[in-house]
Amino acid sequence: MKYKDLRDFLTLLEQRGELKRIKQEIDPHLEMTEIADRTLRAGGPALLFENPKGFDIPVLCNLFGTPKRVAMGMGQEQVSALRDVGKLLAFLKEPEPPKGFKDFLSSIPQFKQVLNMPTKVLGKADCQQVVLKDEDVDLYKLPIMQCWKEDVAPLVTWGLTITKGPLKKRQNLGIYRQQLVAKNKLIMRWLSHRGGALDFQEWKETHPGEPFPVSVALGADPATILGAVTPVPDTLSEYAFAGLLRGTKTSVVKSVSNDLEVPASAEIVLEGYIDPNETALEGPYGDHTGYYNEQEYFPVFTVTHITMRKDPIYHSTYTGRPPDEPAVLGEALNEVFIPILQKQFPEIVDFYLPPEGCSYRLAVVTIKKQYAGHAKRVMMGVWSFLRQFMYTKFVIVCDDDVNARDWKDVIWAMTTRCDPARDLTLVENTPIDYLDFASPVAGLGSKMGIDATNKWPGETQREWGVPIKKDPDVVKRVDEIWDSLAIFENEP
């Protein structure tokens, strides 16, 4: 199922019982977070608050609050089908020429999908039905949520920030939280390695002192939203990837005040600039770690224009101790990562990012071990191959007889196959998430790899234990008589 815009997606969700309309008056200040948090933890539906207190614009929360809805947003019916999305990305990251005619025929579906990569530029679009500028720009009229009691101010959370480096051929889409500080100003919290920050740095070097154009889209179609959080290859734009997911080209329209192209179907678009000389102290905010973060200076985004539909929907979320929406997204996108990793490391059997690990801070990898030291190679590969894992603090590597998604299995492997002095790998002075206050220096800390694999000659001088295995004939015989034993039935 493909969706032309957010409303198309919401219609389907409502038909399937995956969307709940809240007609009571609910306050964007704290109350929406409490309701959304309870709903997400119970595996509940997306929420459309139709009567936000003090505002006349509905608020959409919990849109991707279950892995199933993430899969639906990517045009798939099952979470397991996201592996196919990962295979497509692996193909695009390192395409290989067909090995023969039969191989060419099998590649045709992938090449057909590539035809949907270019964007379709429109002359006018629904996202520009209403245009506000100059004194009419007032961000306080948007129902921007304040999520936690100690948050310093309301926070824009689901904005797709659109930038373009002056030396780059394509635009970048990224999602960065934005603190409301004035009727026309937001603090743009982007980390230095993210696409928007890199574009900004490039602009400052080539256009010193000049304002940097920025547009922010809220409420785009699900393929475009998810394209901004997926590990898209550097050579592929998020719009192009959204076209692949949707099966049709992404429709865009030029911003009214700059040359950046924004999703034509967006609900609301903020346009403006960042003055290279203007920064402000951001935070504190409760974030995906479950703690309030430190304050830090970031660039200020000055909004000069707001464009929107005549009856827009404001798309929002909250972040907090897992599970939250980012954790659910991470759980679903886990399936996308696996084929990409397997393309580079075919020995990987499974890869799992437990949601409790704040989406990316801990990874469990199972491999078909082939030689001594293999586990350490995989650890280093996980940390270096995709930038999504540059902040992963812990990597646990197990054999393929271990279920990476079962903590009981993983802990059994760690406690029986791992010697701390021999099998722990510590790497110091590596990039760490700025929100990780456990690191000794902001943005710089250590990583740990745990080799929980069976040890090969050269890794140990001792005879290695042989795992206990049941006799299959006995298992079959007991299966046949099991019901008649009535072990779990109460005696009369």
Curated annotation (Swiss-Prot):
Compartments, record wording: Cell membrane
Recorded GO CC terms: cytosol; plasma membrane
Gene Ontology biological process terms, A to Z: ubiquinone biosynthetic process
Catalytic reaction equation(s): a 4-hydroxy-3-(all-trans-polyprenyl)benzoate + H(+) = a 2-(all-trans-polyprenyl)phenol + CO2
Top-level enzyme category: lyase
Pathway per the UniProt entry: Cofactor biosynthesis; ubiquinone biosynthesis
Similarity section: Belongs to the UbiD family.
Subunit structure: Homohexamer.
Stated name of the protein: 3-octaprenyl-4-hydroxybenzoate carboxy-lyase
